[in-house]
Amino acid sequence: MLRIGLTGGIGAGKSTVSATFSECGGIIVDGDVIAREVVEPGTKGLAQLVEAFGEDILLPDGALNRPALAAKAFVDDEQRATLNGIVHPLVGHRRQEIIDAVHDDAVVVEDIPLLVETGMAPMFPLVVVVTAPIETRVTRVVKRGMDEADALARINAQAPEEQRRAIADVLLDNSGSQGELVEKARDLWYNRVLPLADNIRARQCVPSVYQLVPYNPAWRDDANRIVKRIQTACGSKALRVDHIGSTAVGGMDAKDVVDIQITVESLDAADELAEPLANAGYPRVEHITTDTPHTDDPALWGKRLHCAADPGRPANVHIRVDGLPGQQFALLFTDWLNANPGVREDYLKAKRHALTEPHYAEAKEPWFLDAYRRAWKWADTTGWRP
């Protein structure tokens, strides 16, 4: 099963994307629908809301008067936190009940308006955020019958746009027509979501990339999301998770592949992470179990390698043991390159040459043999520590 997160502010167009994904075959778990369900008359949720906000949030028939609740719950952060503290746990419990009943091959789209606020984004192998300019969103919401001041209050009460963008693996711009948004959503479903689902099911990585591209500042944002996703999947077994390699070096051309290192206590611990990482979208590459040794004892260079199943964000996830040469050098190498422009240029030349050879990684090894010695000399001189 693939679970993807879908979110967007009020009026952004999230419901249109959700409906499109449903038409494409996705199982929609709608946070708004569940939020209404858990506060229906006779529920524990409604009783808790009445206790917190008063009897005047009820209609004459005993149902929830949503505008009356909103007028109380969105006046300040404390009241909003009270509302969220009641509703969110109930929604989470009901959501899990629905997901547990879904078949294993399904693609589950979890439509969660407050995905940022709940901190749930790292739980998903893919997060889709729908966005639109605030003035466009206000206009849309007012057309639905909401007062403009209330619309602005609701928008301002939700996470700011920068925070939504930070969790987005995919950002769908809905500043155009509804038809344009539907087309974008369909394209995303068939060209990224379904291939990701197939790859996770088959425990299969996306093909390797062998082309240098100009430095992209978005690599750091992508890496931050992957790091958080991996930390969530690994829990305490990951002693640390770091963005390493060329995409972590500011200003340097690189393959469009984000490298991440997980530090663990032992290779046994690394093996225990195989299934959690695969479910998070990073299946294991079974045949790679060691780095190229740069010291006399090859046993010190054992590792595990996982790669991304997401065709839209290639990544390599290296798992190495704390304190061993491979783990230390991966951290050192990134810092050494960032601190030394001349070394960056040398390495870039070596990479460009390696791209002309049949085996890219092997072709770089002669350069790395000398780089290993030079990097540790720099570490000794500068007092570098991991």
Regions found by a protein language model. Give the residues of each.
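ATP-dependent NMP and nucleoside kinases share a basic, alpha-helical "lid"
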Residues: 92-101, 107-143
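Active-site nucleotide-donor binding segment shared across nucleotidyl transfer reactions
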Residues: 112-115, 227-271
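Helical scaffold of the NTase/Pol beta-like nucleotidyltransferase catalytic core
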Residues: 1-4, 186-242
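Walker A/P-loop
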Residues: 15
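Small-molecule kinase domains that catalyze NTP-dependent phosphoryl transfer to phosphate-bearing small molecules
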Residues: 94-95, 121-123, 142-193
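ATP-dependent small-molecule kinase phosphotransfer cores
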Residues: 36-107
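Metal-dependent nucleotidyltransferase catalytic core
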Residues: 136, 143-154, 216-230, 264-310
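Catalytic cores of NTP-dependent nucleotidyl/adenyl transfer enzymes across multiple folds
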Residues: 319, 323-386
